[in-house]
């Protein structure tokens, strides 16, 4: 058989015609130097600030410093495998993370990659990590309560949906415990809500620079109580590079905004922002940005303000969703006038101030009710709570003032003695064990008992036992009363007050 040149050339032409049409054009640069989680890259002329870039081996980084002859890139991963001369590719996309209901019940890193060994996450969408906060027009005043289940907080420092309430205190004063109790407290509310998404609250917990053992312990507690079903944990632990610790809060907020923007409610806990500021300081100094006060860069206020401004209550036209934030700040030796604490205090809508001294006295949660405030105030309380909680703060403030005086004088008049007795019992009543959040109705009944003199004859050491007995009594013999307070929110007076008094009188007779 003869070789036909024309046929061969036709076949070759056909094959050449379709060859290499999907040629990929990539803008690349070269690594000039690398170390401490920072790479200097030459040649990425058109890169954007905040753009994701890719190193060999799939390691990602973010362009932060755009200089005349090179780009400063922070690396999200191990920089030991990157060497001088490596090629760096632009991805042409700003740092984004997965979002959606599929993330609930999972533990992810700062980029949204699962780290709990439960397989990949089927996220429905991706969201840019660092977006602008909602403007003034889409917002609405905070008016729905966000119950923590803690008597001292819900009665005296109420938090509303869409509020930013700072938890501030020294190390080991129970800051994380308050945040964790708040997550656990949502379980009963979420179960009672059924399919009504407008009542449910989803929780996002961000661990920044913490020990892995601490995060594992927290996840275990959430799994044991079943709270993990409505919670997402984002972990950038102490062993993660500084850029990951810096990014994690923004990434987690983007995941939480998915709920806010779909007319649902979310709570985000940043534990803690002091460590994020330290990570950002490290990055900034390595990028040779000029240092300011306490060696933090000049834009460290903006670092936190742009993050916390994303928590908001949206109005009806924008879905009526909300994002509530509980940022945590660790102080050194009770110094709230340091740089980062004063910054975050000025950004947030109030603070829960925890004191080491109270903690060691056994007053836990160790909330200093005099220094703690909620700038949203009683608009974030139910009517029933508002009517019973009013006198508590005043009585405790008067008690603290008198207690300081009473140390000097021995002959006190009857009114002062009565004030001191009542104050001691109210202080005892505000104590609460960890992992034992109470419902709104239970807190109303307990505080009503405290302010209306039911405890005045009970010895101070028995107040805790008295309260536990009362709660047991209410849960077994007065279920209708608790349901009534929960479902028909109104001031505690008239018929409702009589019902509560009747339940308390019945219990007081039996208590011994």
Curated annotation (Swiss-Prot):
Cysteine pairings via disulfide bonds: none
InterPro entries assigned to the protein according to its UniProt record, in alphabetical order: ATP_synth_asu-like_sf, ATP_synth_asu_C, ATP_synth_asu_C_sf, ATP_synth_F1_a_nt-bd_dom, ATP_synth_F1_asu, ATPase_a/bsu_AS, ATPase_F1/V1/A1_a/bsu_N, ATPase_F1/V1/A1_a/bsu_N_sf
Any GO molecular function: proton-transporting ATP synthase activity, rotational mechanism
Binding positions (ATP): 169-176
Cellular component GO terms held in the UniProt record: plasma membrane; proton-transporting ATP synthase complex
Subcellular location: Cell inner membrane
EC category: translocase
Catalytic activity: ATP + H2O + 4 H(+)(in) = ADP + phosphate + 5 H(+)(out)
Gene3D superfamilies recorded: 2.40.30.20, ATP synthase alpha/beta chain, C-terminal domain, P-loop containing nucleotide triphosphate hydrolases
Documented EC number(s): 7.1.2.2
Residues under site feature: Required for activity: 372
Record family assignment: Belongs to the ATPase alpha/beta chains family.
Function: Produces ATP from ADP in the presence of a proton gradient across the membrane. The alpha chain is a regulatory subunit.
Alphabetical list of NCBIfam families matching this protein: atpA, PRK13343.1
Complex and partners: F-type ATPases have 2 components, CF(1) - the catalytic core - and CF(0) - the membrane proton channel. CF(1) has five subunits: alpha(3), beta(3), gamma(1), delta(1), epsilon(1). CF(0) has four main subunits: a(1), b(1), b'(1) and c(9-12).
Name of protein: ATP synthase subunit alpha
Organism of origin: Cereibacter sphaeroides (strain ATCC 17023 / DSM 158 / JCM 6121 / CCUG 31486 / LMG 2827 / NBRC 12203 / NCIMB 8253 / ATH 2.4.1.) (Rhodobacter sphaeroides)
Lineage: Bacteria, Pseudomonadati, Pseudomonadota, Alphaproteobacteria, Rhodobacterales
Gene: atpA
